[in-house]
């Protein structure tokens, strides 16, 4: 059975401003690439954090059945949010530690639902540090943003 990986990235020109998200999905058997699929999208007026979240959401929502997958992101916001902070937010009625509404709560809720359907391992990598798949995800995010740039 191949191992599944999703390499995700978001990009924004200005913050807020036009933005894009990209996903590189790969199925691997050992070091051998079995299948690959690229996803991208964007919005005219958004933030980098929203694009990072949408990349992860679209990666998981694109899977047609419950899967074991490793999601690789360069966003500490996404990784820390889904593996840690979200538990407190849910307990506190989607309020943060300062008792304020959680930013991007609707996207966090979507990610939480998508995450629950799969067996997900979340992994952080440093962005723009020569990680080939992360660089590809970044290129996809920039391509997703392109139609929305003036």
Swiss-Prot record:
InterPro entries xrefs: RNase_H, RNaseH-like_sf, RNaseH_domain, RNaseH_sf, RNaseHI
GO cellular component, as recorded: cytoplasm
RNase H type-1 domain location: 1-146
Cofactors, names only: Mg(2+)
Recorded GO MF terms: magnesium ion binding; nucleic acid binding; RNA-DNA hybrid ribonuclease activity
EC category: hydrolase
EC numbers on record: 3.1.26.4
The UniProt record lists the keyword Hydrolase: yes
Cofactor descriptive note: Binds 1 Mg(2+) ion per subunit. May bind a second metal ion at a regulatory site, or after substrate binding.
Subcellular localization: Cytoplasm
Gene3D superfamilies: Ribonuclease H-like superfamily/Ribonuclease H
Residues the entry annotates as binding Mg(2+) 1: 9, 52, 74
Alphabetized UniProt keyword annotations: Cytoplasm, Endonuclease, Hydrolase, Magnesium, Metal-binding, Nuclease
Catalytic reaction equation(s): Endonucleolytic cleavage to 5'-phosphomonoester
One BP annotation, GO: DNA replication, removal of RNA primer
Binding site for Mg(2+) 2: 9, 138
Job description of the protein: Endonuclease that specifically degrades the RNA of RNA-DNA hybrids.
Family: Belongs to the RNase H family.
Assembly, per entry: Monomer.
Protein known as: Ribonuclease H
Natural source organism: Roseobacter denitrificans (strain ATCC 33942 / OCh 114)
């Amino acid at each position: 059975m191949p191992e599944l990986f999703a390499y995700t990235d978001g990009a924004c020109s200005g913050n807020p401003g036009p933005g894009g998200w990209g996903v590189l999905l790969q199925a691997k058997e050992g070091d051998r690439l079995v299948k690959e699929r690229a996803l991208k999208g964007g919005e005219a007026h958004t933030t980098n954090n929203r694009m990072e979240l949408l990349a992860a959401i679209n990666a998981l929502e694109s899977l047609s059945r419950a899967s074991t997958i490793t999601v690789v992101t360069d966003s500490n916001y996404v990784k820390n949010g889904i593996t840690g902070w979200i538990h407190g937010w849910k307990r506190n009625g989607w309020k943060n530690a300062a008792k304020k509404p959680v930013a991007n709560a609707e996207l966090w809720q979507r990610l939480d639902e998508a995450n629950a359907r799969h067996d997900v391992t979340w992994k952080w990598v440093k962005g723009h540090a020569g990680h080939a798949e992360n660089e590809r995800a970044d290129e996809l995010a920039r391509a997703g943003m392109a139609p929305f740039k003036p």
